[in-house]
Amino acid sequence: MTPDLNRRGAFAEHFGARLRLPLIAAPMFQVSGPDLVIAACRAGVIGAFPTANCRSVAQFDEWVSKIGAALGPADAPFCPNLIMRRESLREELAVLLRHRVEIVITSVGAPDPV
């Protein structure tokens, strides 16, 4: 069951034990990749990357798989940054759902599809 994180304090209750600091690290265009995200999560902060750093949906799927496989249940969650104006948005959303990604950032457009 997916937790309702809209309730005040719910985010901290759900993720707090896995975070050393309440921050998101590394969502940098053409810089952030799986290794940086994994390191951030293992250090206790949310590791992020823009989906635009992946050159294809297949590569995005590979990155999400690699990150998910590298992290344990006590590590901080990772957080792809979905670029809302990308042609591959629907396919990227399908990857996120298939891998049950816990957190998503949206940018460059309205987040309504998410």
What is the predicted function of each stretch?
Residues M1-V114:
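Active-site entrance/lid segments in N-terminal catalytic domains of soluble metabolic enzymes
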